[in-house]
Amino acid sequence: MSSTFSFDVVSKLDMQEFDNALNQAKKELQQRYDLKNTNSSIEFNQKDMQLTLESADEFSLKSVVDIIESKMIKRGISIKSLDFGKVEPASQKSVRQKISLKEGIDKENAKKITNAVKDMKLKVQASVQGEEVRISGKSKDELQTVMSALKEMDLPVPLQFTNYR
């Protein structure tokens, strides 16, 4: 039994679930009484993977952000995939905030993952392949140990495990 097993560590955003969460947030934004006359809006640019939030003041903008975060959490999407920009003034005394969506594991976090795997001193190998990290080894038990350890790591990107072979 000399076969090796492997899995990929990726950071992907489920766009269908994100779209559902966004639609729920827009619906709640229209129905919330405390946000009635704030001209609050949520716009999503799919090409740039960027949300643009606009509201009358910073307090109502914070409420819009809270609505989006709560809907994402309810849909099982990690809010670590959001990269918040600065709150900037917009037209007619309103404020605007841009939020970028992060996908993929950057080189710095991939290095952290591979170093953490090497520090475990298990018989597994970690290799960076673009925006994902492949972990391979001869024992399924060791791979599961690595998986649970990676889940407990506090990284700024959400991790998913795919291609389990």
UniProtKB/Swiss-Prot annotation:
Pfam families tied to this protein: DUF520 (PF04461)
Gene Ontology CC, one term: cytosol
Highest taxon above the source species: Bacteria
Keywords tagged on the record: Nucleotide-binding
Coiled coil (UniProt feature): none
Any one GO molecular function term: nucleotide binding
Protein's UniProt keywords contain Transit peptide: no
Assigned protein family: Belongs to the YajQ family.
Role according to the record: Nucleotide-binding protein.
Protein name: Nucleotide-binding protein Ctha_0558
Organism whose genome encodes this protein: Chloroherpeton thalassium (strain ATCC 35110 / GB-78)
